[in-house]
Amino acid sequence: MIRKLTEAECRAAMKNGDFEAALVQGPSAAIILTQSWCPQWTSMKSYLPKAEEALKDARIYYVEYDIENWEKLENEAFMAFKENTFNNREIPYVRYYLNGVFSRDSNYISLEGFKSRLGL
């Protein structure tokens, strides 16, 4: 499953300091926080369907926060949350969860590295 994060999910992460357990439950999940213009994100986005096929039970979420038209959340506020809470100013930024627990993070990574960090 690959899908975009909602404004409510992003606001909840800002409130709680991480993404809700319901999003990351299951064997593996990845949350990608990025901006639409990033060439490395374009590369990653192109291989996500292959990752989804290989990782049948994985949950893959993303948000391109620079182009979101959120009602109650400013794009810059979400970027500041990502940079300050997760101490990462680079994009794309990826958080990996195994069995519902945060396991590690990365920035751009190859398809094989992405699959490996999700347990394959």
Please report, for each region that a protein language model flagged, where it lies by residue.
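Non-catalytic, surface beta->alpha helical segment in thiol-disulfide oxidoreductase systems
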Residues: T85-L120
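Hydrophobic residues at beta-strand termini and immediately following loops
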Residues: L5, V63, D105
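Local sequence-structure signature of Cys/Sec-based thiol-disulfide redox active-site neighborhoods
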Residues: N16-D57
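Short, glycine/charged-enriched secondary-structure capping and boundary segments
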Residues: K45-L48, E76-F78, I109-L111
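A short acidic, often aromatic-flanked loop/helix-cap motif at beta-alpha or helix-coil junctions
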Residues: C10-A12, I67-L73, L111-F114
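Short, P/G- and charge-enriched loop/turn segments at secondary-structure junctions
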Residues: F78-N84
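Thiol-based oxidoreductase modules, predominantly thioredoxin-like and allied folds used
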Residues: L33, K56-A77
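N-terminal leader/targeting and pre-domain segments
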Residues: M1-A29, Y93, R117-L120
